[in-house]
């Protein structure tokens, strides 16, 4: 595999960081609040294609729309 997937623990940590006290989640891109993480994805801030690593400081939670809009930019 060219780019290894984000490990389960890293994903869980990213979602935990995006979780509000009421259990909802916030998209780091648009700021929209989601009641569950169903429509959210863990994203590399600096894409792996551009040298980004799968480390906590390079991960954020985005809604599908923001993640698709971002692509590898």
In which residue ranges do the predicted regions lie?
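Short, charged surface segments at domain edges that flank catalytic/cofactor-binding sites
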Residues: 1-29, 53, 57
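Helix-centric, low-specificity signal for extended rod-like, repetitive segments
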Residues: 4, 62-63
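Residue-level marker of positions within ordered structural domains that often coincide
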Residues: 19, 32, 68
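Short cysteine clusters
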Residues: 27-30, 63-66
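A short, conserved beta-to-alpha structural element at the edge of catalytic cores
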Residues: 66-73
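Histidine-centered nuclease catalytic patch
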Residues: 31-61, 73
């Amino acid at each position: 595999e060219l780019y290894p997937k984000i490990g389960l623990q890293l994903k869980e940590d990213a979602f935990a960081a995006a979780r509000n006290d009421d259990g909802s989640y916030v998209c780091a891109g648009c700021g929209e609040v989601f009641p569950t993480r169903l429509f959210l994805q863990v994203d590399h801030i600096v894409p792996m294609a551009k040298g980004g690593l799968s480390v906590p400081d390079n991960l954020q939670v985005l809604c599908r729309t923001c993640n698709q809009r971002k692509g590898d930019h």
